[in-house]
């Protein structure tokens, strides 16, 4: 680093170089912030807003970061509208040439597990365990459950009173 003596030392080229160095530093800091923020969220369900739909791929915005829900990770027959809120499973955070890539899925088997942990506190507290999940995305899902507490009905805790939890869960996945 050097110190400029007078204002005459500030030429057009020097000003542009300084601007580029500052902008590069800002971009690097932004990349690091996004990587640290979303690297911790890898393997969880995230909420976002649909920004645009490009050739079947859905671009989802999460504040200062965007993620990609590719066509193969979408539930068949599901339609997406720009501006709609959506939940998706963040299965990969990668550093690419053009920034941080967030890869999302709505068909991943872990998506169901994470949704159950959100909807049913018994699953989050590990009182009820999900032993196995079989899923045909968009059609049906089967879940084998087990209770670690004899006083808690594992099926009832996931279905909820009058099916309230099952309805909320079903509306999220289809």
Regions found by a protein language model. Name each.
Residues 1-174:
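RNA-contacting regions in translation and RNA-metabolism proteins
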């Amino acid at each position: 680093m050097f110190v400029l003596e007078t204002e005459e030392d500030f030429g057009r080229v020097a000003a542009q170089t300084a601007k580029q160095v500052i902008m590069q530093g800002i971009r690097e800091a932004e990349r690091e912030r996004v990587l640290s923020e979303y690297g911790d969220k890898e393997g969880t369900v995230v909420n976002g807003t649909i920004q645009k739909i490009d050739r079947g791929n859905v671009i989802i915005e999460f504040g200062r970061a965007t993620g990609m829900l590719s066509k193969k990770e979408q539930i068949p027959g599901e339609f997406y509208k720009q501006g709609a809120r959506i939940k998706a499973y963040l299965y990969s955070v990668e550093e690419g040439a053009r920034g941080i890539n967030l890869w999302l899925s709505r068909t991943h088997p872990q998506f169901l597990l994470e949704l159950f942990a959100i909807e049913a506190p018994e699953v989050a507290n590990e009182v009820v365990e999900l032993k196995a999940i079989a899923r045909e995305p968009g059609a049906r899902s089967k879940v084998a459950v087990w209770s670690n507490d004899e006083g808690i009905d594992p099926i009832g805790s996931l279905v909820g009173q009058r099916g309230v939890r099952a309805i909320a869960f079903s509306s999220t996945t289809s």
